Amino acid sequence: MKQTILSFLMFVLAMPFCAQEKDTRHEVLLETTAGNIRIALYNETPLHRDNFLKLTRKGFYDGVLFHRVIPNFMIQTGDSLSRYAHPGDRVGDSPEYYQIPAEIVYPKYFHKRGAVAAAREPDKVNPQRASSASQFYIVWGRKHSDASLDNIQKNMTKATDGKATMPAEQREYYKEVGGTPHLDAQYTVFGEVLEGMEVVDKIQQVECDENDRPCDDVRIIRATVIR
């Protein structure tokens, strides 16, 4: 019965993508030292989509590290100078010359496992929640209890002035599959992994130093627009 419910949830959550975007979404292939990850970019976040496509076509992501990896949370990449980092260097703070206005399409796009979202500076210095020009993360996350989700909803209500409410089907997804719901409605989710979640899993389990940088470099060898 539990597996049936989970299968139904996955089907329901995928329906909008299949019905509306199956033939129109751009796709990018990330060839990494841990394996390949294929992602789709959402058309409802056009500024992030177009920026990501532009950077990919310029070769911006070729050679950059996954510089911040936290198990049962996410893997982050996109720091322009990380490709030149020496072992043990702290990376992730390279200067950026622009930001992308937030395109938070919640609750349609949420921090499910496999979500691709834009990193950003904290609310204190970035109240508009504008996104990093290049850094992004892929969600792994964990399963959550009802008590955990109740607490997250309280924090979400406060962070969004009561504008965001977690739908019942998302609560079930977070309980059955997992993700990072505490980031919902506050960070721009602009894509999702189509293939290669086993690679994401492999990366999120690697040994890291005190700065969450993998002890053995994991990098994007090449990023290519494939659709």
Model-derived regions, located:
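Cyclophilin-like peptidyl-prolyl cis-trans isomerases
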Residues: F17-R227
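Bacterial Sec-dependent N-terminal signal peptides
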Residues: M1-K22
